[in-house]
Amino acid sequence: MKKLLSILLSVIMAMSVIIIPTSVSAKKAKTVPNTYVATYDDILNFSKGTITTDFWGPFAYYKNSGNKYITLDKYDTPYGYEGILGYYVRGDKVYYCIKKEIFNDYLYQIKTVDLNGKNKKVLYKVKESKISNVLLLGGYGSGAIFYEKTYNKKVNKFCYTVKLFRNNKLTTLFKVYSDNLTNINVFNGKIYYQNEAYNLANGKKTTFTAKEIYVTKNYMYYINKNNNLKSLDKKDVRRIVTKNVYKYYNSNNGSSVIYSKLNSKKEEVFYKRTGTDKEYKLCAISDIYKATNTSYTGKKHYWINDALFYNNKVYFNISLDGSYYIVNVKTRGSKPSVFFKTTNKDYYIDMYMFGNKLEYRECDPNSYIIDD
């Protein structure tokens, strides 16, 4: 036994990533379409309303995107040390991971709550003193998938233990040893990570090569080793969206997607495509510089924070040489127009969809004050 452990340890040390399946008891389950996982500051819009959480507001449910909301859970927000670490909706329940401070330690809890704010239930909990981090990854039927991150001194790597809580039973699915595992996603009954796909129905793994993965409610987009942007739907149909992609920016949770390529001058050019429709050129980054009366030298002094579909236009939240703008362009291409510019150069813009409306606000990074 000791010899076997010694051999296993040497293999782990020799490879940057090792996948260790440990046990599987997950029977086949229907994956509900709306088990899209939002990040800690993301806004989740779905058929029954909107759920929000960020450093400045409550974890709340707005029915039909109205002004009145129901608080789902409470937490303090001292610079982000507490908060929501992933959440999703299944039926009338919200599944979420919450981090709270308790007795000089932090407690991670995987919980559920009804949309009316009642019937809170703790599925799983662990203290931070025992692990480094917990993140909710997604759902599988009535089960919640998450990982626990710990540091393994023997192999000098982080260990990500992926677990499933379902039918009042906790199952360890597999472990991943990695320096930094940042791209792990759940889509259509499979967990995608480190060029592997783990099938939750049978516990089998297959190779799935992707440099980057982006999950929406109905599609998974990924960039393969040839820099082709591809999509995968819930019938496991794959198609090439475009070749030689530079960056993926966003999707409307359907088959419409925003991305960019580099032209012969190494200038970023933005595109939009819907399904098998033709590819539309939106504009180039130099066009956005012209619209904002900012000098463009060809050197990268800009950053696209987000790109959203709204009313047949694409809205870019962009930083140009330290100034922040919202610039829009028609979905079939046009000259970009400035929609909004911050009143203070030190402020940045938070842009998001709330229900069916585009919302934005100025944020002061020094005092966390928001001007709506």
Positions of predicted regions on the chain:
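Residue position within the beta-strands of beta-propeller blades
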Residues: 45, 52-53, 95-97, 144-148, ...
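Acidic, low-complexity, intrinsically disordered interaction modules
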Residues: 87, 137-138, 143, 258-259, ...
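Repeated scaffold domains used in trafficking and secretory/extracellular systems
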Residues: 35-46, 80-90, 129-141, 178-188, ...
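Positively charged n-region of N-terminal signal peptides that target proteins for export
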Residues: 1-7
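Short, conserved, GDST-rich strand-edge loop motifs in beta-rich repeat architectures
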Residues: 99-104, 150-156
